[in-house]
Amino acid sequence: MRDKIRNARRIVVKVGSALVTNNGAGLDKAAMGDWARQIATLRGAGKQVVLVSSGAIAAGMQRLGWQKRPHEMHKLQAAAAVGQMGLVKAYEDAFSRHNLHTAQILLTHDDLADRKRYLNARSTLTTLLELGVVPIINENDTIVTDEIKFGDNDTLGALVANLIEAHALVILTDQQGLYTADPRRDPNATLVCEGRAEDRSYEAMAGGAGTGISRGGMITKIRAAQRAARSGAHTCIASGNEVDALIRLTQAEPLGTLLYATSSPLQARKQWLADHLQLAGDLILDDGAVVALRSGRSLLPVGVVEVGGEFERGAAVACRSAGGDEIARGLVNYSSSECRRIARKSSTQIEKLLGYIDEPELVHRDNMVLR
């Protein structure tokens, strides 16, 4: 089973606040530098890595001299704004020592709930990975409240795994992994080495919330693993204090707890497309496009003869034959008005007709499911 992590080409690594800030003592730049070194090693092995890092609020608290986490929302958001500056600078310095560029991306749950913004974020992250850049993601704590209230960066890591169709999510924490009971209270507690992410019994084992610095606790990590599994990603929960933890995990060493998915990212995505999309419009295809889609290819503008309905980029549309039969459905890369302007045209003409080009396809095959 550990080969699932070794074979993962695209990995999301989530690092918790307690690790980043050395349990609230300030940014642990030595540890951050070591994770950068390990991620550089993974990049050298041909893997793409996205880093989801907590720590902005905790770093801000330390800079402001606050010993206890405040309850007032405006103070938490102020701490996040102060701490984010130092957090990103420390990572930039660490990765630059390995000749790696980094990119800061601050997300909110709304960015991933809105289909248009979801596709924009997906395109940006995919481009950064193709350029060899290491994206560093955090929740935009300064303007949102959900993450601050609930300590939700574990869930953010799972959502990012879904966004980029990652093969694995690695959650580094200050614990060894999931235990059958709280090892601080039960001497008979044992480490869960691996199991299906969908196994609901793990929630009972996970217990309650985290510390004053780390807000998540094991329960949010288990739920993040369940969410990641629904998009086909395997999750490993392991100690970030282990020497070379990331490197050893990608060498199939049995560290921490592996919670594996039962379907691949693409299979899971196709199932989601088939089950959950509400159609906003129709694309009527010529015979050549029908054959192309049934052969597993993407839908190009040249194959569309008519556009039905009004919709925005990222909406779900049905791809139909001239006779009205639904051939496929998927997420469209352009709005209905834009689709009408580029229908029956070559992809090379998109930029000339629209003034920009998002994608050469109207619907990419990975965002499409045949009927």
UniProtKB/Swiss-Prot annotation:
Top EC class for this record: transferase
Compartments, record wording: Cytoplasm
Residues that coordinate or bind substrate: 54, 141, 153
EC number(s) per entry: 2.7.2.11
An MF annotation (GO) of this entry: glutamate 5-kinase activity
SMART domains in UniProt: PUA
CDD domains recorded: AAK_G5K_ProB, PUA_G5K
Membrane-spanning parts: none
Pathway involvement of the protein, from the record: Amino-acid biosynthesis; L-proline biosynthesis; L-glutamate 5-semialdehyde from L-glutamate: step 1/2
Residues holding ATP: 14, 173-174
GO biological process: L-proline biosynthetic process
Entry's Gene Ontology cellular component terms: cytosol
Cited PANTHER family: GLUTAMATE 5-KINASE, ISOPENTENYL PHOSPHATE KINASE
Cited function: Catalyzes the transfer of a phosphate group to glutamate to form L-glutamate 5-phosphate.
Name this polypeptide is given: Glutamate 5-kinase
Native source species: Aromatoleum aromaticum (strain DSM 19018 / LMG 30748 / EbN1)
